[in-house]
C-alpha cells in the first residue's frame, strides 16, 4: 500500500519539472481512436485525449456530437471530492471533523459521528454496500426513498468507522450534503461558482433527488471536452489556464490511495477520496494512472508521466464490457504515445 502511494505521488508531482513528453501527431491519434468506429456494442459516445494541456485527439461515436451532455454516473463522485476540497480550501470544512458538525440533523444517527475523511474513502462503517441488493444502505433503496436525506439517517452501523471499505453511493451522497450545509447553498450552485465557471464549463446538468439535494453520488451530465478539462485541471495540480481552482495539497490527499482494493476491483488497485489508482504495464514500463470512474465505462484517466488526460463517455450502463472497453482504449492510447 505504501509503495503504491509513493509511486503514484512521486509521478504526479514530479512531472512538472521533467522534460515534456512529445505528443503523438494528431493523425496518429486519430488512427488509434478510429479502431472503435465499428464495434459489437454501439454505445461508446466519445473519447477526448489531452496532452501537455491541449487536445491531441477527439472522436465521437454512434451519432454522438461535441455538444452532447452525457451522464457520467459515478464519475460525478470524483467531482464531489473536488468540491469538498474547494470548500476545505475556503475554510468552510475540515475532513477530520464528524459529519454532524456540518449536518446537524445527523446527530444521533450512525453517520453523525463519522469523520468526513472516512466518508470520502468509503469507510464510514455503515451497512451500505452497492454490491449487495439486500444491504440496508444500497443505492437502489436510497434512490427509491421518498426522502433520501431522511433515509440515510436510518441506516445502521455495520463496522467501526475507518476499518472496512465498502463501495456505496450513500456516503458520497452524504459528502454532498456536508458540502451543501458547510457552504450554505446547494452543491450544484457552489459547483457553478467555484468549479465549472472558472473552468469555462457553461453547459452541464446535475440531478437533484427527491429531497432537493444535489446528488453527490453522481448523475452529473457534461460534454466530453469539459469532462477532459476537469481531468486536465487535476493533472496540473489544481490549476487551469493559470487559475488556481483547488489546492495541490488537497489533490495530493484525494489522489493518494488510502485503501487497497485490488482484491475486489479488477480495474483498480487503490482508492483515495472518490478517485481510483492503478499502475498499468505499457510495453514493459509501469505507468501510474488515477481516474474517475462511472457505470458504463465513463472515465477520466489522468496520466502524469505522459502529461496526459483521456476522457471517455459511454452509455454501456450496467454492462461489464463498458469498463473493459474503456481500459482497452486507455492502453491503446498509452501504447501509441511516448
Residue ranges and their predicted role:
Residues 53, 70-96, 119, 175-179, ...:
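Active-site SXXK
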Residues 171-178, 218-239, 298-314:
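Active-site-proximal alpha-helical segments within enzyme catalytic domains
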Residues 292-338:
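Structured C-terminal helix/loop/strand segments within mature extracytoplasmic catalytic/sensor domains
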Residues 71, 90-127, 154, 183-218, ...:
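Active-site helix/loop module of the DD-peptidase/beta-lactamase fold
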Residues 35-64, 301-303, 307-311:
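A short, well-structured edge-of-sheet supersecondary motif
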Residues 202-204, 256-309:
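Active-site Gly/Thr loop motif
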Residues 5-16:
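Bacterial N-terminal signal peptides
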Residues 66-67, 133-218:
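Catalytic-site signature segments of enzymes, centered on catalytic residues
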